[in-house]
Amino acid sequence: MADHLELATLHRIGSTDPLKRERYTFDFMVNGVSLFEATQASMSDMCGCFSDPRFEHELAHRFNFRIASMLTSDVPVCTGHRVALFVCPECSDLACGAITVRVSRNELSVQWSDFAYENGYEAESKLDSVGPFEFEWGAYLTEIRRASAE
């Protein structure tokens, strides 16, 4: 039985002291469970990799298509690659820390596995309590494309 993926708006409240940028991004809900919470990205002041185009049109226009491609058409069949799902809300740089996932696919489905916290200079910290998940390709593609719709 395939897992169900749904995007949900994720809001980070901004402030002036300390300076924090307000962000509207997306959480990834799998079978009704927030990956933002399950991966503890919420404890590290991260945001989703997709900007919500209803609130962050310019950022969504600049980055969402590329991110959607990394999660869909650019995924090598059988081998896969790693993609950041939750990133620094200020710069999205891996060096600030990110929650990543191995994305792989076959002709009928896409798999998310090997969730980890990475920063590019320390050994990754595996998040063994999260995943793996398998999504039916057509439904998955429809939901990911929703993030890049303007």
Where on the chain are the PLM-derived regions?
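Intrinsically disordered, low-complexity acidic regions enriched in Pro/Ser/Thr
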Residues: 1-150
